[in-house]
Amino acid sequence: MSELKGPDVNVEAQDLKYTPERAEQLLQNYRRVLERIRAAEQDRSGVRTEQSAPVHLVTVTKFFPASDAAALLDGGVTLFGENRDQEARAKARELVAYCEQRAVQPPHWAFIGQLQTNKAKSVVKYASSVH
């Protein structure tokens, strides 16, 4: 994430406000999905083994404000995903500034979907994976 710098990327840290109720709602939903994933991981009837890596839940923030991502980040969620480069880039910028204010590590971002050649240079500035 440290590469997310430059004239078009530097932003003032905004106060990404959210209510405790909204944070709890988001975290409950996240935990519910994660519990279902962990329960499904226990089913070894497929190709998964005890040595298989755990499944990583990518929290997609499409159509949701950066403040929701901040609430989840403050609750311990560290992996977010987007399929729109401009929206992802803006949220990544906001969260980098938010994390710098708090002296915490910024989250990892995944770009989801077809990566067009003209967007590749932009996406690699914030995303650590493409799916």
Placement of each model-derived feature along the sequence:
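Conserved alpha/beta-domain cores
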Residues: S2-H131
